C-alpha cells in the first residue's frame, strides 16, 4: 500500500502520520497501543485495498512524534490531535480501529463525537466505562510507584513479554519502547487512567467488534471482555486463539478475517 508520510503541528508536538487516499469517501483510522507506533497495523492494511481512505499515526510521545523537552503526555491532548487530523481531511464519518490505548481513544471519540464514527474495532483494550473492583482501583493507584521501582530495561522486557506470544512481536515492542524515555512511558500509562469513568448504563450507539487474544495477560481485559459484550447489544466479541495482548500482530490471519467480516455487516 502506497502510504504518504506527512506531519502536522498541534499543542507543541509534530504529529507524524501516514495517509492513503482513494476515490471512496470512506475512511478507516488506525490507533495504536501505548508504547507502540503505526507499524503495528502493517498486517491489517491489505484488508482495505482501494476501498477506503486510510490514516495511521504515531500518537504524540510515540514513534516519530516526539514530545519536546519537559513536555508531558496528555490523553486530552491526544484527543485534540485526533480531532485536528479529522478536521484537516474534513472527515465526517470513519471506522476506527484501536488497539489497547488506541481502543481507549476510539471509545472516547465515539462518546464525545458519535456522529464522527461509523463503526469501532477494539483490539485488546479495557472498557472506558466499566466498573472497577476495589483491588483494581488500588492497583491503579499503586501503579506509578511500582513502575518507577522497575529498572527501565526490565520494564521494557516485561512489557514486551506481556504484549506478544510471537518472538517477532516481542522484538517489535522492545524496539518501540527503547525509543521512549521511562518517564514518558509512565506518563502515558498514568494519563490513560483519565479516560476511565464508571457508567454501567452507557451503551455504544454504533456497531463494535471486540477482539481479544486468548492469552492476553494485560490488566483486566480478558476477564471483562465477555461480560462487556454480553451487556451491549451493539458489541460482537471474538476471542483470538494463539494471541496475546497484540492480537492483531500475533494472529493477523484470524484478526483480518474477523475485521473483513465485520466490515460487511450493517
Per-segment meaning from a language model:
Residues 243-252, 256:
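Catalytic histidine-centered segment of alpha/beta-hydrolase-like enzymes
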Residues 13-67:
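Conserved HGGG/HGGXW glycine-rich cap/lid loop of the alpha/beta-hydrolase fold
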Residues 107-111, 118-147:
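Flexible "cap/lid" loop of the alpha/beta hydrolase fold
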Residues 98, 102, 106:
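Gly/Ala-rich beta-loop-alpha elbow adjacent to hydrolase catalytic centers
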Residues 55-97, 257:
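Active-site loop/oxyanion-hole signature of alpha/beta-hydrolase fold enzymes
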Residues 131-133, 149-203:
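Conserved alpha/beta-hydrolase catalytic His-Asp/Glu region
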Residues 1-29, 51-52, 92, 260-266:
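Alpha/beta-hydrolase fold catalytic core
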Residues 209-243:
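Conserved loop-alpha-helix segment in the C-terminal half of the alpha/beta-hydrolase fold
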Amino acid at each position: 500500500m502506497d502510504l504518504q508520510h506527512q506531519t502536522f503541528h498541534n499543542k507543541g508536538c509534530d504529529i507524524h502520520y501516514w495517509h492513503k487516499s482513494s476515490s471512496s469517501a470512506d475512511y478507516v483510522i488506525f490507533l495504536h497501543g501505548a508504547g507502540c507506533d503505526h507499524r503495528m497495523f502493517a498486517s491489517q492494511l491489505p484488508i482495505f485495498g482501494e476501498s477506503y481512505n486510510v490514516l495511521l499515526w504515531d500518537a504524540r510521545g510515540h514513534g516519530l512524534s516526539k514530545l519536546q523537552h519537559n513536555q508531558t503526555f496528555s490523553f486530552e491532548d491526544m484527543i485534540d490531535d485526533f480531532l485536528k487530523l479529522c478536521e484537516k481531511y474534513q472527515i465526517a464519518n470513519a471506522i476506527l480501529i484501536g488497539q489497547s490505548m488506541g481502543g481507549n481513544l476510539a471509545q472516547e471519540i465515539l462518546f464525545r463525537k458519535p456522529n464522527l464514527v461509523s463503526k469501532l474495532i477494539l483490539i485488546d483494550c479495557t472498557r472506558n466505562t466499566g466498573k472497577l473492583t476495589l483491588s483494581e482501583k488500588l492497583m491503579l493507584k499503586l501503579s506509578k510507584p511500582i513502575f518507577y521501582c522497575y529498572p527501565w530495561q526490565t520494564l521494557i522486557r516485561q512489557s514486551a513479554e506481556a504484549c506478544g506470544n510471537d518472538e517477532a512481536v516481542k522484538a517489535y515492542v522492545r524496539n518501540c519502547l527503547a525509543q521512549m524515555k521511562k518517564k514518558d512511558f509512565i506518563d502515558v500509562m498514568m494519563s490513560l487512567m483519565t479516560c476511565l469513568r464508571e457508567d454501567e448504563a452507557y451503551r455504544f450507539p454504533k456497531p463494535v467488534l471486540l477482539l481479544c487474544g486468548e492469552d492476553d495477560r494485560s490488566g483486566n481485559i480478558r476477564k471483562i471482555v465477555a461480560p462487556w459484550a454480553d451487556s451491549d447489544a451493539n458489541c460482537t466479541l471474538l476471542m483470538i486463539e494463539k494471541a496475546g495482548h497484540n492480537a492483531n500482530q500475533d494472529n493477523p490471519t484470524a484478526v483480518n478475517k474477523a475485521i473483513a467480516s465485520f466490515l460487511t455487516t450493517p
